[in-house]
Amino acid sequence: MGRVSSLALALLLPAVQAQQTLWGQCGGIGWTGPTNCVAGAACSTQNPYYAQCLPGTATTSTTLTTTTRVTTTTTSTTSKSSSTGSTTTTKSTGTTTTSGSSTTITSAPSGNPFSGYQLYANPYYSSEVHTLAMPSLASSLLPAASAAAKVPSFTWLDTAAKVPTMGTYLADIKAKNAAGANPPIAAQFVVYDLPDRDCAALASNGEYSIANGGVANYKKYIDAIRAQLLNYPDVHTILVIEPDSLANLVTNLNVAKCANAQSAYLECVNYALIQLNLPNVAMYIDAGHAGWLGWPANIGPAAQLFAGVYKDAGAPAALRGLATNVANYNAFSISTCPSYTSGDANCDENRYINAIAPLLKDQGWDAHFIVDTGRNGVQPTKQNAWGDWCNVIGTGFGVRPTTNTGNSLVDAFVWVKPGGESDGTSDSSSARYDAHCGYSDALQPAPEAGTWFQAYFEQLLKNANPAF
């Protein structure tokens, strides 16, 4: 859908019109506020719902959409949950079809898929840090910001239009490996485009609707990802599969949208696991986090669901295990359980993993795990409640990606959530506003999910543990 450019709007509107501050919203569906930016900033469209005043002129702001990102549709990288007592109500943070069994694998790759590889630093995230964050940072923070931009993080494929970006990155990795990268580089992507996505919340609604051919569209999306992976069979690729999706089926079937999506979610995830079961791939299904599925009432049903999904897909050899704490804040290991975890003995990710792993093994799946440590550097957190997921105040970057986890069940600590991208808007008039983003423990004002949140990035940088 065509949109009038910010420059054209500036020519059409009176010069006396109110101007939006740097990093403020300046456009989007339903927006009635200022559409001009203060001097030194330009209004840049991030997605149909949100345009933001970014540093620079209208010309330089186009660096936001370089060849490393195919579309400006919102990147929603949020995994959410809210807990009460011993139970949890979750609220999530050219297609080529290729088929055939000749490229699937029938025996599992041996060992930890992270061992012997270095991880790819997400070029789009690096561009966000250098073009959006650093121009307005204090000089004392610039070295730390530059270092953060180099930390490998996952690229989120949250719309079908972004799948070709895989080809750009995989080609770059292939070239670097051919040039002698030592150890060789591995790619990291998040598969995140289910129909009726984010079924228990509003902040990260996706592009597909079950009622409007969403399942068929999702399968085309997976086929396109498979085609990219087949084009680069010599690039080792690690995938996180559908944050929040299966966890919502454990705790949120009382929500009509989730109940209606249950069969579609299972069908789509099953299709993804089968089609992406390739020799150069290692997959981890998202498994929420300790404050979501670690509760006594939830952990058994969660293990049953995950093991069932594993078996229903034919025990894919490329399916290594589960990803936890995606886009969340939990400690991996904490000596004293925080007060907001009261009632859940599994008060950190280490305890959660150690509790669910034997339940999975009892049902035939010897699963391993990865843990997102991108925003868990401050412990305990400043959450008023464990389920407060949106742009939580006081957080910091956590441990950098490593295979040195101290737990043989845990393959690696990783950065799945790109730190500095918003979890959701605090603007209550927005179509995608979720009340969690207006809570007192959420940093405000906040832009739409997936768009750059300068104040949050600075918070993560200042509170990084270990420091940069």
From Swiss-Prot:
Record-annotated disulphide pairs: 26-43, 37-53, 199-258, 390-437
Keywords assigned by UniProt, alphabetized: Carbohydrate metabolism, Cellulose degradation, Disulfide bond, Glycosidase, Hydrolase, Polysaccharide degradation, Secreted, Signal
Span list, region Catalytic: 107-468
Record text about domains: Has a modular structure: a carbohydrate-binding module (CBM) at the N-terminus, a linker rich in threonines, and a C-terminal exocellobiohydrolase catalytic module. The genes for catalytic modules and CBMs seem to have evolved separately and have been linked by gene fusion.
Gene Ontology biological-process annotations: cellulose catabolic process
InterPro entries on file: Beta_cellobiohydrolase (IPR016288), Beta_cellobiohydrolase_sf (IPR036434), CBD_sf (IPR035971), Cellulose-bd_dom_fun (IPR000254), Glyco_hydro_6_CS (IPR001524)
Keyword tRNA processing: no
GO terms for MF: cellulose 1,4-beta-cellobiosidase activity; cellulose binding
Function: The biological conversion of cellulose to glucose generally requires three types of hydrolytic enzymes: (1) Endoglucanases which cut internal beta-1,4-glucosidic bonds; (2) Exocellobiohydrolases that cut the disaccharide cellobiose from the non-reducing end of the cellulose polymer chain; (3) Beta-1,4-glucosidases which hydrolyze the cellobiose and other short cello-oligosaccharides to glucose.
Compartments in which it is found: Secreted
Residue ranges, annotated region (Thr-rich linker): 57-106
Main location: secreted
Signal peptide coordinates: 1-18
Domain of life the protein comes from: Eukaryota
Chain coiled-coil ranges: none
Enzyme class: hydrolase
Record-annotated CBM1 domain positions: 19-54
EC number: 3.2.1.91
One Gene Ontology cellular component: extracellular region
Name of the protein: Probable 1,4-beta-D-glucan cellobiohydrolase C
